[in-house]
Amino acid sequence: MATPHINAEMGDFADVVLMPGDPLRAKHIAETFLEDVREVNNVRGMLGFTGTYKGRKISVMGHGMGIPSCSIYTKELITDFGVKKIIRVGSCGAVRMDVKLRDVVIGMGACTDSKVNRIRFKDHDFAAIADFDMVRNAVDAAKALGVDARVGNLFSADLFYSPDGDMFDVMEKYGILGVEMEAAGIYGVAAEFGAKALTICTVSDHIRTHEQTTAAERQTTFNDMIKIALESVLLGDKE
């Protein structure tokens, strides 16, 4: 049944949901990659759709910006609508010089300056990691598509406009591939409620060099990321 944030019924969502931050990007994914699409959510403008990809039922819905927003939607999808796997598809900023614009990053883990996982884990550190099989399937899908994806840790920041520039030096030292705002929260929700999750990001800007992708470049590389996510779902069905 409907929740305060999702006006759908059980069965409206597939067991796998792709989640970009922007609800309009969710609409674009549904219209571009899925067939037999129908809208299943529009509360607060957070659009959600269900359709099929190569005959496989898949849903796509926005999750908004930041851990609090994405945590609400992922929790409700898992506990109220039977969703088993969530794949965040978004953008990130690079801090390492060997990570380039338009690189696709598969987030096997996510550090964070948020306390959300400490709250749920009795004030202890929680290793916020993606599901191994989902990571492996994404890597295999990327190889099959000819995309040289990077695999490693992300950093989920609470502040988009951070006043602590020195923190980027620490991230680089520890090998962080990209900075975004949601992965650690999504991995924590999945762990708490018995689901599986993965984050795949496209590098849209470089924090060190101040380079940014153009709208056309973002669209092309974004499509590569979505194809990886969708094909990884099909690979997961073969397990």
Swiss-Prot record:
Keywords: Glycosyltransferase, Transferase
PROSITE patterns: PNP_UDP_1 (PS01232)
Keyword Secreted: no
Site entry: Important for catalytic activity: 218
Binding site for phosphate: 21, 25, 44, 88-91
Catalysis: reaction(s): a purine D-ribonucleoside + phosphate = a purine nucleobase + alpha-D-ribose 1-phosphate; a purine 2'-deoxy-D-ribonucleoside + phosphate = a purine nucleobase + 2-deoxy-alpha-D-ribose 1-phosphate
One Gene Ontology term from the biological process aspect of the record: purine nucleoside catabolic process
GO molecular function, one term: purine-nucleoside phosphorylase activity
Location of the active site: 205 (proton donor)
InterPro entries with a match to the protein in the record: DeoD-type (IPR004402), Nucleoside_phosphorylase_CS (IPR018016), Nucleoside_phosphorylase_d (IPR000845), Nucleoside_phosphorylase_sf (IPR035994)
Enzyme Commission no: 2.4.2.1
Family: Belongs to the PNP/UDP phosphorylase family.
PANTHER family per the UniProt record, alphabetical: PURINE NUCLEOSIDE PHOSPHORYLASE DEOD-TYPE (PTHR43691:SF2), URIDINE PHOSPHORYLASE (PTHR43691)
Quaternary structure and partners: Homohexamer; trimer of homodimers.
Record function comment: Catalyzes the reversible phosphorolytic breakdown of the N-glycosidic bond in the beta-(deoxy)ribonucleoside molecules, with the formation of the corresponding free purine bases and pentose-1-phosphate.
Protein name per the record: Purine nucleoside phosphorylase DeoD-type
Organism taxonomic ancestry: Bacteria, Pseudomonadati, Pseudomonadota, Gammaproteobacteria, Enterobacterales
